[in-house]
Amino acid sequence: MREVCVNRGGQAGTIDDALVRRLHDELDAAEADTRCRVLLITSEPGVFSTGMDLVDAARTPGPQESGGRFFDLLRRFTRTPLVVAAVVDGRVAGGGVGLLAACDLVLATPRSTFALPEALWGLLPCCVLPFLIRRTGFQRAYAMALTTRPLGTAEAAACGLVDEVADDPAKAVRRLVFRAGKLDGATVGDLKRYAGALWAITDDTRRLAVEELDRLMALPRVRDRLTAYAAHGRYPWES
């Protein structure tokens, strides 16, 4: 097993290009290790990931190339011959939900919460929805995006976003690693390839997601909200 922690402490687990590159590097290393069957994504307790780095987004008015790179990372999760698993102990929002949706298995503690707050900023979870719909079904993913309401762990488990609720995640991880160790990596890859053919996330899906993200990020109302947050720490619902 190879473990990577996504929470960067002071930045509360925001997703930026550096994190995306680091996750790609960890995948490269895990895939190169013939003994490794599991890439485990973890965080510091309290916050798993808050999604897009909004301060960085405020400084980047042009096309969001990072959106395409993030989409490619999620798609790689669904194709690698590794079992990609995540342990959640706390809050997950925005792109963090996308990371989970693209994982093969998600373990979460009872106190965890899961939300898509993008609409509050005038945005949409463009890169997240294709993977979340595949995992939870259309209506649950759509409702999460529309209402922006956080789900508790029990709700997330009921809709398939969480695979196991664990008071003791370490014990659940040991069980997972034990069982994954019995699988041939080629078989995991075959399963992902076949499942991907049954529910395809294509290059056209990627293009649609990135183009829509670029369109929304260029809207004046969105730029104003991001700028206000970056400059004054003011959220849209506080204005």
Residue ranges of each PLM-predicted region?
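Glycine-rich beta-to-alpha active-site loop
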Residues: R75-W121, P150
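Key positions in alpha-helical "signaling/recognition" and NTPase switch elements
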Residues: L99-L100, A156, Y229
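Hydrophobic, secondary-structure "cap" segments at the distal end of domains
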Residues: L129-Q139
